Amino acid sequence: MPGERRRFAQATKSVGVSWPAKVRRRDGTLVPFDIARIEAAVTRAAREVACDDPDMPGTVAKAVADALGRGIAPVEDIQDCVEARLGEAGLDDVARVYIIYRQRRAELRTAKALLGVRDELKLSLAAVTVLRERYLLHDEQGRPAESTGELMDRSARCVAAAEDQYEPGSSRRWAERFATLLRNLEFLPNSPTLMNSGTDLGLLAGCFVLPIEDSLQSIFATLGQAAELQRAGGGTGYAFSHLRPAGDRVASTGGTASGPVSFLRLYDSAAGVVSMGGRRRGACMAVLDVSHPDICDFVTAKAESPSELPHFNLSVGVTDAFLRAVERNGLHRLVNPRTGKIVARMPAAELFDAICKAAHAGGDPGLVFLDTINRANPVPGRGRIEATNPCGEVPLLPYESCNLGSINLARMLADGRVDWDRLEEVAGVAVRFLDDVIDVSRYPFPELGEAARATRKIGLGVMGLAELLAALGIPYDSEEAVRLATRLMRRIQQAAHTASRRLAEERGAFPAFTDSRFARSGPRRNAQVTSVAPTGTISLIAGTTAGIEPMFAIAFTRAIVGRHLLEVNPCFDRLARDRGFYRDELIAEIAQRGGVRGYPRLPAEVRAAFPTAAEIAPQWHLRMQAAVQRHVEAAVSKTVNLPATATVDDVRAIYVAAWKAKVKGITVYRYGSREGQVLSYAAPKPLLAQADTEFSGGCAGRSCEF
C-alpha cells in the first residue's frame, strides 16, 4: 500500500496543469472550478478512517484536476474521477467512505426531487419539507414555483424596496446584500417575512399584542382581528386582565359575567379553526394579572386537562409586591378590574404554590415579571405593558408588533474562532433589514401600522448558540459558556445600537422619540433593537440549534415524507468523522440514549461539549438566560428544563431565582409532564428519540411557531 501511494504521488507530479474552468452542476448552472472543494471532500473521507497522511488529499485533488482537462466538467464526472483516483492510489478505505457519502447525497437529492423542490442552498430534508409545505410559492397545480434560493431572493427584494423611499435607486444594491445574508443562512427573519414577502397577504411581522377591554364589543372585535392576523401567519398575545371576574354583575342584562377563562377558551377554539386553513398552527399568549379575582381558575386552566387550550401559552403577570409578599408570607389582594375594589385577600404563598404546582404538572403557567418589564419600557408615556407575544420574547403595548430576525451564530466562526468583525457587520445589515420590514409590511388594520411606525421596535436575536459552543469545545453548562454568550450579545447589541443611530441620521428618529426614555440622548431609529426568540422553524431551515437553547438530542429520528430518518447533530457528526470515531452503530446507540454524557465510549471532552437540555442542571439554564438578558432590550425566550424527578419546590426555587436575576419572563418544563411531548428518551425498551417534521429543538413543552 505505501509503495502504491508513493508511485501515485510521483506520477501526479509529472502531469501538466490543465484544469477545468467551470463546473456544471446538476441543475445545469455553471460555477468556477475550485480544487479546494475536492481536497476538502477527500480530507473528510480520510479523517473518518483515520488516514493521517497530510499530503494525500492535495495529491488526489491535483490528480483529479489534471485528469479532467480543460473546459467544463460535470459534477458527476468529477466525483467519478475522485473515486477512480482513490482506487488507483490504493486508498480503498477512503474510497469506500467517499462512495457511501455520494450515495447518501444521492438519496437526499432523490427525496427532494420527490417533493418537487429545487434546493441550491443544500438544506436538510426536514427544512426542504417545511419550506415546500408553508413557505415556497406554488403554481396552479400546487407544485413549488420557486427554489429555496429564490425564496430568499424574493424576501430580500421585497424588504429592500423600502430603501427607495430614502435613496431612490438603492433598493437593488441592498437587495443583493440582504440576499447574501439569507442565502448564506447567516441571518433569517421571522417566518411571515419569508412566507409573505411579495404576496397579496404582505404581512411580514411575526406577532402582535391586541387589547381586550371589558365589553362584548371589544372582546369580539379583537377576536375578529386576531383571526385575520392568524390567517396570515401572525401570532397574537393578549392581556385578559381587564375583563370582569366570573359571577360579576352585567348591568345591561341583569345577568352575571362568565369571566376571562371562558373567553380564553373561545379565543383558543377560534385559533384552531383559523389555523386549519392557514399556513401555520395558531399560537397565542394569554396573560392574566396576579391580582385578578379569577387568577386561580386561570392558573389551573391547563393543569386539570392537558388537552385544554392547545393554541395558548399561559403566563401570570406577577409584580414585585406580590413576590415580596410571598417571601414574607404576607397577604395578597384580589381586585375587581371593573370597580377597582378589593374583593378578597389570600396568602400570597398559597397562590404562588398553586402556580408552581400547575407549572410542575404541565409547564403552564409561566411568569411575566411586569415591573421588571415596565422599568425597561422604552416609551412609558404611551402606556403600561401588560402582555407579550406568544413566546414571551417581546413585551408589547396594544397593537404593537414583533419584527424579529436572528443571527446564526454557528456561521460566525472562522478558523476555529468567533469572527467578531463579521458578527458586527451582519448585525448592522440585519438592523437595516428589520427596519425596512416595518415600511414594506402590510397591516390589516390602521392601528397596527400606526403603532409599528410610532416606535419602530425591532428584535434582533440569535440562534445556534449551542452549536457554536460545541464547535469551540465549550460545555454549555460552564462559566466559559456564560461569559462567551454575554460577550456575544453585548457585541450584537452595541452593533445594533450603532446601526439604529446611523439610520436615524439618514431617515430620522422614531416618531415617539421625544416621549421616550432616550429623549435626552442622541436620536435612534428604533425604540427597541434586540430580542432573543426561540426561532422555531427558522433554526430548522438554517440547520442549527434553536435560539439560545441547548441541543435537545445528539441523534434522533424525524418523521419526513412517510419515513423515519435518523438525524445526527451536524456539529457532532463533523467532530466524530474528523476524529475518526464515527460509526453507524455508535450513532444508533446514542439515538437510543438521546445524549452522550455518561457514555463511556466517547472521549471525556466530547461528552462535556455536547450536553442536551435534559442533562443540564436547571440553574445553568437560568444563568444563561440571565446573562443574555443583560444585553437584550426586550426579553429572552428560554425554557428551563427540569428532570422528571423535579419537585414543586424546585419549580418554586427557579421562579424566585428568575425574578431576582431580573429576567423578564420564565418558563419551566419538567420532562415527561405533558402528554404527547415531541421528544422521549424513556421507554420500556430502547426507543429512538423522535421529532416530528417541524421540531427544531426548542421547547419540548410549550407551543412555539415563530
UniProtKB/Swiss-Prot annotation:
Induction behaviour: A member of the dormancy regulon. Induced in response to reduced oxygen tension (hypoxia), low levels of nitric oxide (NO) and carbon monoxide (CO). It is hoped that this regulon will give insight into the latent, or dormant phase of infection.
MF GO annotations: ATP binding; cobalamin binding; ribonucleoside-diphosphate reductase activity, thioredoxin disulfide as acceptor
Tree of life domain: Bacteria
Keyword Disulfide bond: yes
Note accompanying the cofactor annotation: 5'-deoxyadenosylcobalamine (coenzyme B12).
Top EC class of this enzyme: oxidoreductase
Domain (ATP-cone): residue spans on this chain: 21-109
EC number: 1.17.4.1
Cellular component, GO, one term: peptidoglycan-based cell wall
Further comment found in the protein's record: Was identified as a high-confidence drug target.
Protein family per UniProt: Belongs to the ribonucleoside diphosphate reductase class-2 family.
Known function: Provides the precursors necessary for DNA synthesis. Catalyzes the biosynthesis of deoxyribonucleotides from the corresponding ribonucleotides.
Name assigned to this protein: Vitamin B12-dependent ribonucleoside-diphosphate reductase
